């Protein structure tokens, strides 16, 4: 189902990032950078392992945010 970037997915990812950032009173870019969000909306990882392979996502972010982002991406891919 890949084929370029999904604008809708990118916006949804931004929304989720803001929600997670607000919960911790962090700037959004600390959670994940825009570059990473673009990569996510293109590659659309549907497992936490795949999420962790995205450039810019380390082990810490994979464990901390993987579940939420993967869940959102799955809703778009199905």
Model-based region annotation:
Residues 1-78:
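Accessory DNA-binding and partner-docking regions appended to nucleic-acid-acting proteins
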């Amino acid at each position: 189902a890949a084929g370029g970037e999904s604008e809708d997915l990118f916006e949804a990812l931004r929304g989720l990032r803001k929600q997670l950032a607000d919960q911790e009173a962090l700037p959004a870019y600390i959670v994940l950078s825009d570059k990473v969000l673009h990569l996510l909306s293109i590659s659309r990882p549907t497992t936490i392992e795949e999420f962790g392979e995205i450039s810019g996502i380390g082990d810490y972010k994979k464990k901390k945010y993987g579940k939420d982002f993967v869940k959102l991406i799955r809703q778009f891919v199905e």
